[in-house]
Amino acid sequence: MKDSIDFGSMNISTLFRKLLIPTVLGMVFSALFVITDGIFVGKGIGSDALAAVNITAPLFMIAAGIGLMFGVGASVVASIHLSQGKRKVASINITQAIAFSALLILILSALCLYFIEPLARLLGSSDRLLPLAVEYMAWYIPFLVFYEVLNIGMFCIRLDGSPTYAMMCNAVAAILNIILDYIFIFELGWGIMGAAFATSLGTVVGGLMTLIYLLRFSRTLHLCRIKLSIKSLLLTLRNIGYIIKLGSSAFISEASIACMMFLGNYVFIRHLGEDGVAAFSIACYFFPIIFMVYNAIAQSAQPIISYNFGAGQPERVRKTLHLAIRTALICGISFFILTVLCCQDIVSLFIDRSYAAFDIAVNGLPYFGVGFIFFAVNMIGIGYYQSVERGQRATIITLLRGVVFMLIGFFALPPVLGIPGIWLAVPLTELLTTFYIFGIYLKDRFIVCRR
């Protein structure tokens, strides 16, 4: 299962490619979780069900963010320890991250289920969409713990030198989700409950695959027993605090997508009603695919940057960063062109032309796609600062992008530009973030030159 990878001496381009290809493929399979639900729900149940799933989406983006936070933080810490020859410490770090995040998500899941109807209303559900939103959450929330294990396990398995197996975990989960979606929705007629249950079973299988690898097949990083003495628990909490500090910007990145969905749902339902939310939901199904590709590029660069940062090899860090930025920009431009040229085809994947939401989405997606180019630069910039233990800077960038600039976009543009302004809110957010990252980069260069 282990691939031939040496983070400290292998050619950067070769090393990056070895990590990138299976990681991107794995992320594409992860995206199938998202897009398959959208296609089957839209085609098999209707636009109201599509809107209801989008209403609940911010909750699941938050859950994904928790997994990314612990995954990124633990991976950075473990990478640096591995570069210093501390294998046992690295294994303890990843075990603590998985155990603590699983406990946290179980507690949050119980609270969400207890307050499920008020939660659906808080997320913006109308009376018409409420029964569908509640039903979807009721069949997905109980299984979120496996989604967390799958998310964190991906980082650990790639760091262990097995990106291909990490890809397979996502692939098996996604393929199972597709098969079960078709059976539950079209053959058994289980409706939105079937869509939620299919996704849940897929994540259960993927999560178990990661646990089996870390328990039985890993060669460097192993799950180990956590001591329950007071001293050990205090050390665990200290380590968890540092992991959260390093990975918090990853959580905020995911939470910013949740914020985008929440604000977008709120603004669209005010201006265009449920049809507007259904149209926006198509963009929200498409956006995570873009996010996952950029995230795959950032995640492929992360262990290389972290390892060589810990080993004191700045030139290898610089080469990896530049390669990641070039790769992300090529993808961003390609995604934008694809969105403009294939807009109607993308929308028709989810809903028929007979729905009013179809024309709203076709007219709006090209505006929305402008942001994909700037989003590419932003993801790599945030990932770089995480990888070199500058978590505070990464967190500030992510907060500006996910909250401050997003609020400016959604509430400043619509009064001026009307409906196109709603679609352009996210691109404006990404553009402002790119300007900020470029500004601090120039500031850092100026300080270095003065020295």
Residue positions per predicted region:
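N-terminal transmembrane alpha-helices
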Residues: 7-45, 58-73, 77, 81, ...
